[in-house]
Amino acid sequence: MKKFLIAAMLGGLLGVVVAPQLARPLLAKETNQAETYKQLELFGDIFDRIRAQYVEEVDDKKLIEAAINGMLTSLDPHSSYLSPDDASDMRIQTRGAFGGLGIEVTQEDGFVKVITPIDDTPAAEAGVEPGDFITHVDGEGLLGLTLDEAVQLMRGPVGSEIVITVVRESEPEPFDIKIIRDTIKLTAVRDKTIGETIVMRVSTFNDQTYPNLEDGITKQIEAAGGIENINGFVVDLRNNPGGLLSQAIKVSDAFLEKGEIVSTRGRAPEDGDRWNARTGDLAQGKPIVVLINGGSASASEIVAGALQDHRRAIVVGTKSFGKGSVQTIMPVAGDGAMRLTTARYYTPSGRSIQALGVSPDIIVEQPRKDPNSTKEDTVEVEGATRTEADLRGSLDNDSLSDADREQIEQERARAEEAAKLRDEDFQLSYAIDLLKGLSAIQPAQ
């Protein structure tokens, strides 16, 4: 009987304790909802006052779209509202052709910052560089505008001229750049062979990226007479602003036999996802160097991070941009769309790239060309590479055959080409030299 009474008392006490604990979340939820409705009433009140009392008549649709966009852009630099026209433009861009200047931009502290100019576009040809801040478009200031509003100012008819004012860290004063708008046709991948190295220049991640990559590698291997005549691959991701996650996964998978490529984690555990490599390596086990710089962002960082973590590639260059978030495009009423950050992505080792970027295994800066350098400077450098054979009256090597002399001439031509490449693109030259070195110490097949 005593045991029963004790049990009953405990049950009663637990009931007293548990009931408030169950009630608290419900009360908190009701309080939060009440506060939300209160804030929505405030929004409605302000909206009505603007319509009634603003100095000029306002467009209700534009006002609401601006409010929606303000709500989204307050979250992070990559979330935004896309009007029906903007949503249509974005779908065109992922297919590989659109009109404009050819730059990828973001917003930093209220200013428009260039992530990178896209290869062979008006912006790239006009001299726009990664890290440039655009302060004015045709004399109109951009400070205070949303990113979409600033981008809208830069749009215009193909063939029309635009003047952007740029602030660059290496320049003491802002300066203007004139650009002629054009149709931007993105070539996702360019392929070539330099010496015994296949160079794959990946400039964006759109629907054409992986098919172009696969076709280019196959073509270059066949042209070389087989993979045995190739010492390695350079995957050039410099100034690549990113693009489709699905294409970044396919490009990474192209060089990995197994293991995780990338994972994403959202707010809730069930929002996460993971992608793994499948058997097959387009490079057939040959060494790979990945080139990155501050203009390499998003999908580029997924590829660089995956190949680096699996020790499948040596990453060379400078630290990447550091965009480690995933945006989901969600259709909304009225044919518009919402670009919302829904997850962060992580490399196979669990690294988050967000705001940190991918650090290269070997840091190699791209030297800035000195505009004040003269032809005499170049001649002096070339003179430093002279050999005994270049001296007047030097003795001939009497043991050389015609084949030896032909080989010497070929080596001289290759050396001249290498010197030219070092002057034009030091980072790429370094990557190719690195693969030559790796090839030299590998055991004979």
Please annotate each region the language model reported.
Residues 2-79, 112, 227, 400-445:
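Terminal targeting/pro-maturation regions of precursor/exported proteins
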Residues 54-115, 159-163, 167-178, 184-188, ...:
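Extended, small/polar residue-biased N-terminal targeting/export presequences
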